[in-house]
Regions:
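Bacterial N-terminal signal peptides
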Residues: 11-21
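Predominantly soluble domains enriched in secretory-pathway, periplasmic, or organellar proteins
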Residues: 22-369
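Bacterial N-terminal signal peptides that target proteins for export
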Residues: 2-12
Length: 369
């Protein structure tokens, strides 16, 4: 089918958002680039497992700091940043050699994660123990700034223009707005009780914040940083993800064992979908047709059709499935099973488990390069 292309005019902010979205998509959806490698943070054995997607085998096991929880891949795919909760370190690995090039001390804490700024020059790491964000120069591994934020920060999201970052603090009930040019807090926004997860809409207009203690989602206008609405959802909302087109946001409610579908045009919950026990993480297929939800308490995945707003399949996996990532080509989902010390591999065409790959103890964070 021939498609007619029409010229459109877009402003510099839109261009920045498109480029930022593209770089983020390539970092997290690398299937179109050819080789795919899965990285798993093994919290209980202080290692990172490297899995080759084609062979479905562990090709390397890398010793890192104590209690690794998350792995983040730089936009140029040259580095992996491993946040280690117990040793409070960030370990930086050169890829694909898997050599340790730097260890940044006192940089993170439990639940801490690293994200990369626009262009990939700097990484920003949350430190829940010290209530601050550590700024690291990616190429050198040098710590360049420490930004004090609210009490108990774990998540962080970068604005589409690369100029700001947003950090919810669970005990302060606020979201800190960071000026990344100056590495200071520009303002703080009230965001319900125990704000936990944050996500920015595809068009860059809205910031959503889950209030794990107030059972709602705070909608913040990005341009003004004003609270537009608080949307009631289920109990203990802990995870947020936008669909590819940005028309819907999906919220995992860990306390009520369901998923809320929010229509962004009306900013209302359009459907509430029951899932398994204690939903933990979710990822969408590249087409956006299905969302896969890990259920820690029932040891399975709920597969939800975004078109019908219903569970179409429940897939058994290992014990206490925590994080999930879908490969960029949409062929496989990889699930970190913290209780059985392995990775479940799901064929997304058949929606059937095809492999269980043994890794280290208590695998948690998982990502694809």
């Amino acid at each position: 089918m021939t498609r007619i292309r029409r010229a459109v005019s877009i402003g510099p902010l839109a261009v920045a958002w498109l480029l930022f979205s593209l770089s983020s998509a390539l970092a997290h959806r690398p299937g179109a680039r050819g080789s795919q490698t899965v990285y798993v943070a093994n919290e209980g054995s202080d290692t990172v497992s490297v899995i080759d997607v084609e062979s479905m085998k562990v090709t390397a096991t890398i010793p890192v700091g104590a209690g690794p929880q998350h792995v983040a891949i730089s936009p140029d795919r040259s580095y992996a940043f491993v946040t280690c909760a117990r040793s409070k370190e960030v370990w930086i690995l050169a890829l694909p050699a898997h050599t340790v090039v730097a260890v940044v001390p006192d940089a993170t804490g439990p639940g801490g994660q690293a994200v990369f700024g626009y262009g990939g020059t700097y990484a920003y790491v949350t430190n829940s123990l010290e209530s601050r964000v550590t700024v690291i120069e990616v190429a050198t591994g040098r710590r360049v700034a420490l930004i004090p934020v609210g009490d108990l920060p774990t998540k962080i999201e970068i604005a589409p223009d690369g100029g700001h970052a947003y950090v919810p603090s669970e005990r302060s009930n606020t979201v800190a707005v960071l000026n990344l040019s100056l590495n200071v807090v520009a303002s703080e926004i009230p965001a319900g009780v125990r704000p936990y997860a944050v996500a920015i809409s595809t068009d860059g207009k809205y910031l959503l914040v889950s209030g794990a203690g107030s059972n709602n989602i705070t909608v913040i206008e990005m341009g003004t940083h004003k609270v537009m609405r608080r949307i009631p959802v289920g109990d203990d909302p802990h995870h947020l993800v936008f669909g590819p087109g940005g028309s819907f946001a999906y919220v995992l409610n860990r306390g009520s064992n369901n998923l809320s579908m929010i229509q962004m045009a009306s900013r209302q919950v359009m459907a509430t979908v029951p899932v398994g026990k204690e939903p933990s993480d979710a990822d969408l297929t590249p087409s956006g047709r299905y969302i896969y939800v890990t259920n820690i308490g029932s040891n399975d995945l709920s597969v939800i059709s975004t078109q019908t707003s219903a569970v179409v399949r429940t897939i058994p996996v290992g014990t206490r499935p925590h994080d999930i990532v879908i490969s960029g080509d949409g062929r496989y989902a990889f699930v970190a099973n913290t209780g059985s010390d392995d990775i479940s591999v799901i064929n997304l065409l058949t929606q059937e488990p095809v492999s269980r790959i043994p890794v280290g103890r208590r695998p948690r964070g998982i990502t694809v390069r």
